[in-house]
């Protein structure tokens, strides 16, 4: 075969067609059917994607609708707020405008009032001036008339002139009275009364002295004369008695003063009218009497005889009565008119001249008395005017009257306006506004109506009286006219007529007086009725006019204030009503605007919905078109593929023929070479093996006569794109041929894909291999090597490969099967794993694990029990199946394939995991076996590194380059970074009433996560942290937790589908507190006393656990309470033998937490030491007890097969060789493990120094004794049973109840004897048990024996040194305290050390400390770490703030570290004099037990080498803080270490079949992994934990978790 003849399909050697193989047509049809199925599957996938797109569009539509609704709501709220602000602003403006208008209106009204007042004052001044001028004129006229009073006595005077004179006098008196009334209203009434009295006296005097008879011809009658003479005497007596009129005047004045009116504004106009009418009536009567008197006087003065007045009176009607406002000009005209009448009147003759002179003189005296009286009255008036009644007071009274009238008018106008406003408001408002009352308005209206009614009644009464007075006045006029007519009708009447005339005159006088009295009485009653409220307290002292005026002013002011307040209230009510009307109108307008806006928004949303619907239709159309196009393309590709297959089939036929030709040629060549070899056999010196080789070649050639070829269906299993693009998969390229060397040439190993060597060479290769692998590993390595043709070999090599090719057909068929899409599963690492610490020498391809890490697993487990997996940080490699557990029901099983489409086409061929697993061997064997060429045709050749640096980087960086070159797809990390950023597997764990813990699987380990609680940012966790615990929650509350990825700014622009996950949970109600942990029962120094210790529950600052207050702890023994401790922080108590109920049968001790709401559940029970009841009270020193129950499943058959029953002698250091050998034979695949080393104790009481770690290790490697300890039995060697020499101090015996799988080790060093327990060396069982979930330790001390670690045993560096007297030396106590601190777990909450020196010293020392104190203690040991990589936090870290706290270091640098890892995965340490944080995944701890080989220090824990310089630095670091002490294992199991079991059946305690008591039981499904604590109780239940919940589980439903490989 030549180089230019490639194989048709690659992957298998071509061979002639078998007779039983199907025809090409059937193969083509089968291929087409498969293609159609594939197309159908793709079509279904496209449909599924279309449905997902539709759902996505529906989700976007809903989001848009929700966002539109939110925007609309925000816009509505914004507009509402703007509208309210605008409404308030407009309302304020309207209020200000109304207030300004009111103020302007009030100012305008005041200006109008002031103008009106000024006008009224001007009018009043004008009227006053006119009245004063008239009064002065009348006074002047009266004086002139009085001076000329003698005109009646003249001879030429007539009766008419006398009457005219009397009329003028009457008018002057009337005008004088009204002048006084104009000046002072009170003085007018006084003068009127006085004038009335004088007028009456004057009239009486006239009537009495002028009753003459008409003149008769006969002589005068003496009786008449006597009668005429008597009146003068009476007149003299009357006129001369001036005191009588004075007294009358005083009485009338006092009467007038007593009835003075207090409210002149109401009664003054009416009174003025009535007084005017009275004055008019009196003036008429006075004029008549004066006329008669003047006539009689003229008759008397006449020289003729006296004649009667009726005879001499003229028949003319009486003259017109003068009016009050008659001017002086009118009086002069009247006087001029009356003069002719007087002249024409003739005096009656017959009277005696002397008599007439005497009468005239008497009349003149009477007139003088009257004149004097008038002068006195005038003087008195002037005196009173000067005394108190000034013009200013009168003007003030008048101004107050006018002001009152104006205010009354204003009040009436305001009432009208208020009534109009109220009517308007009632029309505008349908209902009154609550809180406002109309009481003030109603009271104002009632007050106004009542006042108007009173005024109307008063005015009506006064008008009625005025009408009565007017009627009486008319009667008086009629009577006077009638009298005057009767007197002038006949000049000579008879005596009877005269008597009737005088009788009528007397009746008239009587009627007039009665009418005057009636008027005065009515005025007095009205005045008293109006002035009841203002009556003076002192009735005897009359009120002065000034006080009356002041009281009137005060009353007016009070009334004015009331009216002002009423006006203000009405104004406020009117403004409020107007404001309510405006608000209502504004609300109406706002509602209209809002309705319009909502309609517009609705229209917009409707348009948007229509647009979205249209877009969805268009999208569906486009999707259909795309699907049709894709189907058409697929059909075209299928037809093209069919054509290619037909062509390839023809080519395959040609190839078969060519191969047959090559085969025949090879056979001929083989025969020729056989002949040549036979010829060479007979040559001397040729080895005998040549014949055997020739025979083997001939047999191979004969067997190769039946060549086998894979069928077409098997060849077409490869993916179509791979077959179309890639050439035949042969790792030996034509350009770079590889010559396979002879097996005897050396230990080099050819390519894994090459099968040119025969099967017989495989054992030879295994023999020549220098590696110490087990047979199963080697067989699995060779079984997974895929075969491939090398087209550029010579003919001899092809002939040699014929038979192996036929035998490797099953391998080829398996290697060329269809690459199924790898099944991705999510696993959880149960415990930590470091491949460098294991027995395997090829650990470069294995992944280091940390407990709690998530591992993505591809495919199924291989035959060696390894998975192909990848960590979240991108590292890939092999994962032991016994260290991880699958997460059932994980959504990530299908989530990653949906999110990353590039994972689908990538296939892992069969055995590829082995290529990765065994590829790690190439890195370790590259210097011994040579170069290995691994990769695809189109990839570059990957050369194995020759240095340790290359191997280290390949191990820690996940062999990325090797994975890429070995056809492994790397889309997982990129897919997670691009598609799966949201945290997955968000789960809830450890939910209490006040706290909860969440965990998640990081979608991307490169970015930090933000934890939200109820949609509020709670905390920012750094990258790599996948759990968080909430504290301070409220019991019985629903919380919503969301965990999201915080992306950098450059990635925020990318449209991620989701970057967060949400979880909702409810905290339980504040229930019973949590039970205590780590209950331990130990011996006390006193016999018969037990020490029960526990770890107190975690309480908050308020002293509560699970939401309730903790009060103490109760100790139960087999379910019976024996004692209580009333302390929430107590950690131990003493239990005496007498307190046990049934001492010999008591086994379990449990502790409960007490609270006010009851007790908690039982803690994990602790076993009472079995030797407690059989222990003698006189023992020298009670032993330390530690019970370590670790029931992990082990291979008990192999343990039984081992002969471990030999007993060890007290001092035989070499008696453990044979049992150890037998034990190791039972487990051939295991490697020697390190053992627990304890320093020897001083036997003679002297100070004994502890052995160093190297010496102790060497010593214990030599002195080991194994003893089989069956379960539930005491150890064969107890304290006191071994030979103890006399004189030696008692030893400290560390013993306990043995557990299955433990081997009792007993060794003696010097005189000290130490027993310890070590677990058997079964690796898989050890790994499974170590990484099972278990309770973290909380109690470590000298009283316990640290259990052996599974990879390196925790070595104890200090010994307890006690002298013979039981005392402890200071330096030993110091060393022991430091050792206890180093052994204490950083996360532990309590450290207990029990000192048991001598039997007489019964001392128990308990030390406790918080985690903070342990971590921050200055005595914490210093740990030394080695940097594996360069670290620059400012360049690598995403968070710049966190980068400032990290330390920068270089690869190979030694770092000093204090404490353990924090929650974020960082150490606290020192580098180059700087303190800060150190990432835990970039450093490795340097153990003290390093060994020096060839000038380099080797670290057995990690496989790194240290140079001498680094070794010196290490010694300097450790010596600076004292001798270095390694830290103990942080995962040391406590009492009843949890056991992992699997549920065989479904179990739901809530249904009726499982029983009624469902509380406190777990719900399980078949296959669930349950962590069990403690043994089975008396009811057949385990106490276990599953999914973060704890409860009881039936024991018959659980099975032990099987061990792989058993």
Swiss-Prot record:
Domain Fibronectin type-III, by residue range, is 982-1070, 1075-1171
Q: Which PROSITE patterns match?
A: FN3, SH3
Locate the compositionally biased regions of type Polar residues.
Answer: 750-761, 1377-1386
Kindly give the InterPro entries that the UniProt entry links to this protein.
FN3_dom (IPR003961), FN3_sf (IPR036116), Ig-like_fold (IPR013783), RIMBP1/2/3 (IPR040325), SH3-like_dom_sf (IPR036028), SH3_domain (IPR001452)
Superkingdom to which the source organism belongs: Eukaryota
Compartments where located:
Cytoplasm, Cytoskeleton
Signal peptide stretch: none
Q: Where is the composition biased (Basic and acidic residues)?
A: 41-51, 327-340, 700-717, 1364-1374
Mutant phenotype after disruption: Males are almost completely infertile, but otherwise have no visible phenotype. Sperm morphology is highly abnormal with deformed nuclei, detached acrosomes and an expanded perinuclear space. Defects are first apparent from the round spermatid stage and are associated with abnormal development of the manchette.
Q: Which SMART domains match?
A: FN3 (SM00060), SH3 (SM00326)
Q: Name one GO biological process term.
A: spermatid development
**Tissue expression pattern:** Specifically expressed in testis, where it localizes to postmeiotic germ cells (at protein level).
Chain segments carrying region Disordered: 1-27, 41-70, 217-249, 295-352, 677-731, 744-781, 1234-1255, 1364-1392
Pfam families documented for this protein: SH3_2 (PF07653)
Question: Where would I find the SH3 domain in this sequence?
Answer: 822-889, 1420-1488, 1536-1603
Q: Kindly list any coiled-coil regions of this protein.
A: 24-146, 352-431, 461-649
CDD domains xrefs: FN3
How does the annotation summarize its subunit structure? Interacts with FASLG. Interacts with LRGUK (via guanylate kinase-like domain). Interacts (via C-terminus) with HOOK1 (via coiled-coil region).
Under the heading PANTHER family, the entry gives: RIM BINDING PROTEIN-RELATED (PTHR14234), RIMS-BINDING PROTEIN 3A-RELATED (PTHR14234:SF21)
Q: Which family does it belong to?
A: Belongs to the RIMBP family.
This chain's function reads: Component of the manchette, a microtubule-based structure which plays a key role in sperm head morphogenesis during late stages of sperm development. Important for male fertility.
Q: What is the name of this protein?
A: RIMS-binding protein 3
Which gene name belongs to this protein?
A: Rimbp3
